[in-house]
Amino acid sequence: MSELLSFALFLASVLIYAWKAGRNTWWFAATLTVLGLFVVLNITLFASDYFTGAGINDAVLYTLTNSLTGAGVSKYILPGIGIVLGLTAVFGALGWILRRRRHHPHHFGYSLLALLLALGSVDASPAFRQITELVKSQSRDGDPDFAAYYKEPSKTIPDPKLNLVYIYGESLERTYFDNEAFPDLTPELGALKNEGLDFSHTQQLPGTDYTIAGMVASQCGIPLFAPFEGNASASVSSFFPQNICLGDILKNSGYQNYFVQGANLRFAGKDVFLKSHGFDHLYGSEELKSVVADPHYRNDWGFYDDTVLDEAWKKFEELSRSGQRFSLFTLTVDTHHPDGFISRTCNRKKYDFDGKPNQSFSAVSCSQENIAAFINKIKASPWFKDTVIVVSSDHLAMNNTAWKYLNKQDRNNLFFVIRGDKPQQETLAVKRNTMDNGATVLDILGGDNYLGLGRSSLSGQSMSEIFLNIKEKTLAWKPDIIRLWKFPKEMKEFTIDQQKNMIAFSGSHFRLPLLLRVSDKRVEPLPESEYSAPLRFQLADFAPRDNFVWVDRCYKMAQLWAPELALSTDWCVSQGQLGGQQIVQHVDKTTWKSKTAFKDTVIDMARYKGNVDTLKIVDNDIRYKADSFIFNVAGAPEEVKQFSGISRPESWGRWSNAQLGDEVKIEYKHPLPKKFDLVITAKAYGNNASRPIPVRVGNEEQTLVLGNEVTTTTLHFDNPTDADTLVIVPPEPVSTNEGNILGHSPRKLGIGMVDIKVVEREG
């Protein structure tokens, strides 16, 4: 209803101003600004829905403010471009419509009415309401009854007898198991669900609606609310350090805790969370690549579900035979939005819906088959009688290709339990939420029936039953939950440990690189993860007087304030204000200590603008002074006009990437010398090794041969035509995720370049 009202007010404002208000620059600007805000808010809502399927909420802040945690990023580039182009077109059209009768005399009454209607359209819009609620949730003091409902369980289980297998199905919500809505979509896993304890009404609450948040909620009994934005949990050294979570209790009770997934463990801070709470054995894409049968069989996120669950089964066998009490947690990935992935071993590779193939449904049908096969192996084993199997979704599905069909149903998270010691077959329709999962498991294992805000659904009463407005209540508790982090509110001294790549201050530790916004009563860490904007772009969003501490590789800040360090890959610390003074310090000791030094200076807006403009220069446009092209830093030498076919800088150099261009092309500002030596320090990838690699300058071509290790080769060129472009053509670029950013499409690698130098020859 509010959507229709807000749009009606918007349309009325446009029509009244365009046909009745007449000409007045101030009223035109004011009305266009407010109407433009309406457009921006609704496009933001649309974009947020596109990424997460949940509007503008904490998941958007966590996932989109500084990272794209739930996205295979390459698949969102075109929609992103479309949104920008659409926004530009709408603004242009809006301005043109409002100025239709600009030659008519100004009418104050109609202008005021149009502006009031525009303001009303903004106030009535769902986007404005959601953002307002988010802002309020950030500034509340908390709810006095939090302490009455937040309960810490005993740190041990008195007499543990059962092993635990806990399977998180990525986005595998219970809605998919509705056979009337989606016939024969989940037959194998659905049959297993019907054999166990099936909890049919597990709702999703704020702060539990993305992977790491769902894991925290299910293991600690609290939503993931933090004193920082974005993906900062990937940079902290501990995760809710004061809380008792399921993993802590299991470890204290003699369990060895294992976690296996196909994606990188560092993503979204899962490794930090698990290590902070009792898990000593973690396996992700990096750990598995040396043990899986086919390390090249991967999707955009990591290893396919069939590979991961095979490794989980091997681990289950090994641990069961050892006689050691254990828990084995695993997380699938093939059902990740927007489309999902199909494991090659599946029989169910295709699912049609609405008369056409649907990739997301196909991925669900395939993944549930793999999960069911894993469970059936456990059930057929002699160790099943000592095992509890839990299957749950980490969160509801985000905006995938099945999302519009899911939204037509009553959506709930998946949570069911199969007990080997005491088979029980029952569907329990009790109202509950993800925070109750850990408490229910703890109860089954013989521990307490409460965990944080979670309650056992077998012997306790869920917060979802106690509070009819549980979503609002959860947001009211947000400040109380944030305080559980015990996060410092000031930063005066800090220490950098180069061996660990960590910064420490006020008792907290963070991974480097890191940007910090420091105010009187708050320290806000802004990390650089796989999907966050580079720290310099985040710094460019700071206000002129915001105090900052920026710890990064020297070359990244050198172009602004320390040109002598433009080629240094050491750590440097910059601090100050963008509109005031800044200092850059070179970290020259293994353990380096310093203090914050923010001077209260007069703000220079010209300096601020210059700093912001420089910070926003994209990597390929950065230029530095050097006599060679150094590939492990961003940019290129001043002599280079432009380049293409080259991937991002890494610690050693850069790969050629045929996704960006079939050949490496470096165009110089001026013609290359008549006679010169080309000194290339590089290596080859895969089948490009020991193959002739053409290197061209103008009409002359030389051959380069590289191995898999870095070597230096000198080629001799004559350049009678004054050519200004160097071209290198890898013979067989290889599609691979080697060294790739999690969630990105594979790169096509050919040669790895460390340094290229042009040396003029005499004569």
From Swiss-Prot:
Q: What is its EC number?
A: 2.7.8.20
Q: List the subcellular locations.
A: Cell inner membrane
**InterPro entries the record matches:** Alkaline_phosphatase_core_sf, DUF7024, OpgB, OpgB/LTA_synthase_biosynth, Sulfatase_N
Q: Which GO terms describe its molecular function?
A: phosphatidylglycerol-membrane-oligosaccharide glycerophosphotransferase activity
- Pathway of action: Glycan metabolism; osmoregulated periplasmic glucan (OPG) biosynthesis
Query: SUPFAM superfamilies of this UniProt entry?
Result: Alkaline phosphatase-like (SSF53649)
Recite the UniProt keywords alphabetically.
Answer: Cell inner membrane, Cell membrane, Membrane, Transferase, Transmembrane, Transmembrane helix
**What residues form the membrane-spanning segments?**
1-21, 26-46, 77-97, 108-128
Q: Does the keyword Transmembrane helix apply?
A: yes
According to UniProt, the reaction catalysed is: a phosphatidylglycerol + a membrane-derived-oligosaccharide D-glucose = a 1,2-diacyl-sn-glycerol + a membrane-derived-oligosaccharide 6-(glycerophospho)-D-glucose
Gene3D superfamilies listed in its UniProt record: Alkaline Phosphatase, subunit A (3.40.720.10)
Q: Give the first-level EC class, as a single word.
A: transferase
One GO BP annotation is:
glucan biosynthetic process
One GO cellular component, as annotated: plasma membrane
**What is the membrane topology noted in the UniProt record heading this document?**
Multi-pass membrane protein
The role this protein plays is: Transfers a phosphoglycerol residue from phosphatidylglycerol to the membrane-bound nascent glucan backbones.
Q: Which family does it belong to?
A: Belongs to the OpgB family.
* Protein known as: Phosphoglycerol transferase I
What species is this protein from? Escherichia coli (strain ATCC 8739 / DSM 1576 / NBRC 3972 / NCIMB 8545 / WDCM 00012 / Crooks)
